[in-house]
């Protein structure tokens, strides 16, 4: 049996009763987190533009666009919700099983799969248990493919959330549609030819578009396959197939016979983001916040801040002096400066107005990111970070964190996840809605229908924001705005 066939065989045969209770528990947390960051992201300019695009296209089959009163055909709802889920770079990240993997992180696994499952799940009127099963299956396929693909894929410039995310999404949708094994094979073949997404677009609106297109591609490919559309039946392993063309190969031992054995959510796990910024900044972000609070530090006390990491981190956190909030998400100097000045690093901190503040710009100039030889030698399975703060009085304060809160080694509690959800959801829906969503996800497996959840994820609060006049204004603003991207140093 070839690999493509093996993936399709797993998806077609796995049932809800096969899923370990611990995986169900973990999945509920990832889903709650994914819905929260998507609600927050639904208010972002990039989401407003996509929402306007979806509204203009129209269509008869209606599925909810989160945080709004807008509905759309399933592929376009998946697009809009996928963009929203990644708009703030606040969605979860997949760990690697190898110390040699780039960054030790691979994809943002939840957003493409969740956006696709939510849209098609509403369309097909599935139960909460069916929702959970499809999500878990999609994430498992996505994570195993991402873990096995040659690291050259990401190193050469592909964004794996965009490319691999679609393959997870299409299998999740295929599970909802109850596609047979031979149809799932074709669905993979179709979706693999749709895969794209380039890292040069990091720091722009196109990065979240990658996640949205992955979700949309998954829905479209599954529906086409269901209708009889043909594709290669060995698309993953073929010489001119996905792994070889996109990466020059893959490690078969990391995927063959590994689907659900154990589930990737269990080992090595998925990390939930404590901050709305690039994952590689999070151990340092955690550390600087703890040091600042423990020593009651203020900007006026600090002569310099030195941040040491492995050599891969500067290749992703590429903005030494960001000009926009999008760029600030990939900037160690901003992450350090805002933590010192505000002792927080939440949604309210990653906004354009903060990035441009004189006091922030001044403090960013005192931050240096360097490659630490000791941390480099330890490998890339964790984003180990060391901080050295030199004070004007001659004192030096140092610390090191290997992982941040939300990592499987430092997991967030349900209460912490609920608090993050409320922070995110508060941008888009009333507090009562947020509370209902938390309750519904906690008992998701018992839901006979998704209707109560869908209703709670949209609101009258968003209606005013989603008016055609305001969306048109957002579109016009974007046409006039020039993205002044800083190049790699």
Residue spans for each PLM region:
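N-terminal core-entry segment
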Residues: 1-268, 311-313, 446, 450-471, ...
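Intrinsically disordered, low-complexity Ser/Thr/Pro/Gly-rich interaction regions
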Residues: 278-439, 455-475, 481-483
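Short, contiguous strand/loop micro-motifs
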Residues: 157, 175, 275, 424-425
């Amino acid at each position: 049996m070839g690999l493509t066939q093996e993936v399709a065989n797993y998806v077609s045969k796995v049932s809800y009763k096969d899923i370990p209770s611990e995986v169900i528990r973990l999945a509920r947390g990832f889903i709650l987190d994914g819905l929260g960051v998507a609600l927050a992201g639904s208010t972002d300019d990039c989401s407003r533009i996509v929402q306007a695009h979806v509204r203009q296209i129209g269509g008869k089959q209606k599925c909810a666009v989160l945080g709004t009163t807008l509905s759309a055909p399933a592929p376009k709802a998946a697009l809009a919700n996928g963009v929203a889920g990644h708009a703030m770079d606040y969605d979860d990240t997949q760990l690697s099983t190898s110390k040699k993997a780039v960054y030790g992180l691979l994809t943002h696994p939840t957003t493409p799969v969740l956006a696709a499952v939510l849209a098609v799940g509403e369309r097909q009127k599935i139960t909460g248990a069916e929702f959970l099963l499809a999500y878990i299956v999609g994430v498992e396929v996505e994570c195993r493919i991402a873990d096995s693909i040659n690291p050259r894929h990401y190193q050469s410039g592909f964004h794996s959330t965009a490319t691999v995310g679609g393959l997870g999404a299409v299998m999740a949708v295929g599970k909802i549609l109850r596609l047979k094994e031979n149809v799932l094979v074709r669905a993979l073949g179709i979706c693999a030819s749709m895969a794209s997404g380039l890292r040069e677009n990091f720091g722009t609106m196109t990065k979240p578009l990658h996640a949205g297109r992955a979700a949309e591609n998954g829905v479209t490919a599954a529906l086409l396959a269901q209708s009889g559309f043909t594709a290669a039946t060995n698309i993953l392993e073929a010489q001119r197939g996905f792994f070889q063309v996109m990466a020059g190969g893959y490690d078969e031992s990391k995927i063959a016979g590994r689907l659900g054995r154990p589930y990737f959510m269990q080992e090595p796990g998925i990390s939930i983001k404590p901050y709305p910024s690039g994952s590689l900044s999070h151990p340092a972000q955690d550390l600087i916040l703890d040091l600042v609070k423990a020593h009651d530090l203020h900007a006026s006390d600090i002569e310099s801040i030195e941040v040491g990491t492995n050599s891969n981190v500067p290749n992703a956190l590429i903005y030494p002096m960001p000009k926009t909030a999008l760029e600030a998400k990939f900037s160690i100097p901003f992450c350090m400066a805002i933590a010192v000045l505000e002792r927080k690093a939440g949604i309210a901190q990653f906004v354009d107005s903060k990035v441009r503040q004189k006091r922030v710009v001044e403090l960013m100039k005192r931050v240096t990111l360097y490659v630490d030889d000791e941390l480099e030698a330890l490998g890339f399975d964790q984003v180990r970070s060391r901080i050295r703060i030199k004070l004007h009085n001659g004192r030096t304060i140092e610390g090191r964190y290997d992982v941040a809160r939300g990592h499987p080694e430092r997991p967030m509690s349900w209460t912490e996840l609920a608090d993050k959800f409320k922070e995110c959801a508060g941008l888009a829906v009333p507090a009562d809605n947020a509370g209902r969503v938390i309750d519904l996800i906690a008992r998701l497996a018992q839901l006979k229908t998704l209707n109560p959840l869908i209703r709670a994820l949209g609101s009258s609060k968003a209606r005013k924001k989603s008016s055609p006049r305001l969306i048109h204004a957002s579109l016009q603003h974007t046409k006039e705005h020039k993205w002044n991207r800083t190049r790699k140093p």
